[in-house]
Amino acid sequence: MGRMHSRGKGISSSAIPYKRTPPSWVKTAAADVEEMIMKAAKKGQMPSQIGVVLRDQHGIPLVKSVTGSKILRILKAHGLAPEIPEDLYFLIKKAVAIRKHLERNRKDKDSKFRLILVESRIHRLARYYKRTKKLPPTWKYESTTASTLVA
């Protein structure tokens, strides 16, 4: 599948191992992994950042193979999941940064165009999340209040 607003195909990706059991060299218990996830979430880290930290610093390749459930499901079970999905959050953050740039550089036409593309992605993703009930049906992206969402 290609990119939305460019010509790239984006075909390179890592392969998830077929074996669903944890590797033999992972000695960490499921309860300890969940505790690490809770600590990181309370510090304010996003689920993908938590996964990277667990992989790089603690040697846990896949949380699902160790605990039986994914990081976001564990966070939801403990009430620590972010209210806005992570990919939407970072798109909103990007739009806020572009708007801030445009306040200082009003004649930057390319940034104006890129802002339109980013906001198109935000609206499309928000529509999907409303349909799948990950966002409330009354949720709406507004550029004036976007900076409060990512602050």
From Swiss-Prot:
Coiled coil: none annotated. Pfam families: Ribosomal_S13_N, Ribosomal_S15. PROSITE patterns: RIBOSOMAL_S15. The keyword Transport does not apply. One of its GO terms (molecular function) is structural constituent of ribosome. InterPro entries: Ribosomal_uS15, Ribosomal_uS15_arc_euk, Ribosomal_uS15_N, uS15_NS1_RNA-bd_sf. GO terms for biological process: translation. NCBIfam families: PRK08561.1. This is Small ribosomal subunit protein uS15z. It comes from Oryza sativa subsp. japonica (Rice).
